[in-house]
């Protein structure tokens, strides 16, 4: 397995709308494994293929962070949502930053598993929030897009500064 490079906001590639997966082959299975490896390495609970510059509708989730409840959603569709909730969300593409995003408390999602079999999932709590967050990525949306322009610009400035610091340390 390989750790993939996570795109950092405001990288324009994060705005790309992902295409549906049509082939379920060994390459897809390896990519899913690499997504999980990357997600765990970065200490995340969810990752969308868009975040690693692959613009296919693939999401990996494990809200335990302990490799015990791996969930793969391919070509996910939100069918229903109810209730209102929200938390200070973080994101691997916005390292070290958090922002409040209003979300549905419960969601129903239809997706394909890694073998291409369709299933329906009813989720609530953190799992529901994570699913909505990752589907946003597939639609070219990051949580910063929900924030005021002032907060969004501050985040961009912090991340540009962080990227410059990282570049200097790597040189």
UniProtKB/Swiss-Prot annotation:
One of its GO terms (biological process) is co-translational protein modification. InterPro entries: Peptide_deformylase, Peptide_deformylase_sf. Belongs to the polypeptide deformylase family. Binds 1 Fe(2+) ion. This is Peptide deformylase. The keyword Secreted does not apply. SUPFAM superfamilies: Peptide deformylase (SSF56420). Pfam families: Pep_deformylase. Transmembrane segments: none annotated. It catalyses: N-terminal N-formyl-L-methionyl-[peptide] + H2O = N-terminal L-methionyl-[peptide] + formate. Its cofactor is Fe(2+). GO terms for molecular function: metal ion binding; peptide deformylase activity. Removes the formyl group from the N-terminal Met of newly synthesized proteins. Requires at least a dipeptide for an efficient rate of reaction. N-terminal L-methionine is a prerequisite for activity but the enzyme has broad specificity at other positions. It is an enzyme of class 3 (hydrolase). The lineage of its organism: Bacteria, Pseudomonadati, Pseudomonadota, Gammaproteobacteria, Pasteurellales. The active site is at 134. Keywords: Hydrolase, Iron, Metal-binding, Protein biosynthesis. NCBIfam families: pept_deformyl (TIGR00079), PRK00150.1-3 (NF001159). The gene is def. Its EC number is 3.5.1.88. It comes from the Bacteria. It comes from Mannheimia succiniciproducens (strain KCTC 0769BP / MBEL55E).
